[in-house]
Amino acid sequence: IENEGSNPAGKGKDTNKEFILYSVYDQKTRPASIDLTQTLWKLTPSRKLIDMFVCTDGLPIDKSPKFQGYQKRGDEFKNRDYRLKSYIGTPDANTKLTGGNAGYTPYKFTLYGRNTTNKDEYSNYPVLRLAEVYLNYAEAVYERYGEITNEQLNKSINKLRGRAGVASLTNELVTENGLDMLTEIRRERTVELYMEGFRYDDLKRWGKLEEELNESRCGMV
């Protein structure tokens, strides 16, 4: 987010109203300790994460007729949740990404057009943001009552899905397509909070850590 051409609304970290608590980084008082575009090999996303992003109709890729498959490079990014292109580098990304060993590279928290080796990348890092509050609420409601109403989904998870250009998560969508509501709530948490340090502890909380970490790790097709 650098200029009027790429950011006509002038949005940036100084106008961010979503972060409730956050760590501030800038070139003078607190430079970043790593280069996001160069050294995040340990955060390289696998195809499993990529496949977790739903299509614009709100359905997982194995359920959605909108999924374009893997025939050509970039096909899998079409008709998908906007967060996929925001978080993962695409073949036409404006920021050149060189880290990664699975064919995918992390794009989240990078700056538009930057590709530096001098740590000149200064996005603030969230400690607590509004999206996490929404996700905590939806998960807590479902875990407590074994169900969640569409109204409760609309004031939590669907605020995130709407921003990402994805159809709302509803009880009807789940029932009509043979989905599981808890799985979809957890999916939303996983994709929204990618690279924010939650996944490992979430898997432990859900009793899924051993199962998930022992699966094969695949890269780009």
Residue ranges and their predicted role:
Residues 62:
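Short, electropositive, low-hydrophobicity segments enriched in small/polar residues
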Residues 34-40:
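Active-site-adjacent substrate-recognition loops and nearby beta-strands
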Residues 40-59:
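Short, cationic low-complexity segments
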Residues 1-34, 65-221:
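Acidic/polar-rich alpha-helix caps and helix-coil junctions
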